[in-house]
Amino acid sequence: MTFQKSTVVPAAEGRVKIDKDDNGNYSVNVKVNNLAKPSRLQPERKLYVVWMETENNGIKNLGRLKSSSGFFSDDLEGSLSTISPFKAKRVFITAENESNLQYPGSIVVLSTSDFN
């Protein structure tokens, strides 16, 4: 599934792939291109966090979006691969100052539509 067009970072585009494994867990793979450095946003932020809205368990922090260099460099690409026991309703990315948050901030950079 692709992310919808962003009003915060219009050039950004990306995909989310979710597969259910033999143990009933979900493999979540996120890839994003043309994402601005979070320090260039208004207000300025330090990093991007990937979130998953689940069907029955609220919103879960999946982790920090990482680039190949560890920080957002000139390639402006990011990715995240993780496992979740929860079924996704949608996935979205926020700009934050910390990665270990329980709830997303208000700056939603990219979001999928609801999964069927």
Go through each PLM region and give its residues.
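N-terminal targeting/export leaders
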Residues: 1-116
